[in-house]
Amino acid sequence: MTAQTMQIGNRPCRIYGEAHAEYLLLQMTGEHELQSIDHEVAAIAQSSRNFLFAAVPVENWNDALSPWEAPAVWGKQGFGGNAADTLRFLTEQVIPTLKQQFDLSENVKIILGGYSLAGLFALWASTQINLFYGVAAASPSVWFPGW
């Protein structure tokens, strides 16, 4: 399955899959994860499900994915608490754009996934809105202060 890059907002999202998909898989990704995305999508493609996968890049991981501000836990960089802005970007730009460009049903099953802090973001986002059919949180950062 080949990828295409689609500019959504100011972010180059990597998109895999087909129009009219039954599932829309969204994954917040850092630069360090992009090398393994092709393998991840190939594994998902082994299923019989028709899906569209979007790797949505995150520039400042600690700020964009943290649900609230918190001091540094390791190192010197704290957490900015901008997860609400990231969730708004997904719901107001990414999802509507993908639905339109790939002719997805209004009832498409949306699954939000992520690893580490992106996994925590996925868990948190599922508590904020009733939009996601499922969440995949791989090794989520549940150590996050206040979680």
Task: Locate each region found by the language model.
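N-terminal cap/lid segment of alpha/beta-hydrolase-fold proteins
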Residues: M1-E18
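Serine-hydrolase catalytic machinery in alpha/beta-hydrolase-like enzymes
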Residues: G9-P12, E22-D103
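Acidic-and-aromatic substrate-binding clefts and catalytic sites of carbohydrate-active enzymes
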Residues: E33-L34, V142-G146
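Active-site nucleophile loop of the alpha/beta-hydrolase fold
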Residues: V58, A136-F144
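Short helix-loop-beta connector
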Residues: S105-V108
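Short beta-strand immediately N-terminal to the catalytic nucleophile in serine-hydrolase-like folds
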Residues: I111-G114, A138
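Gly/Ala-rich beta-loop-alpha elbow adjacent to hydrolase catalytic centers
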Residues: G113-A118, A122
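Conserved hydrolase catalytic core segment
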Residues: W124-G134
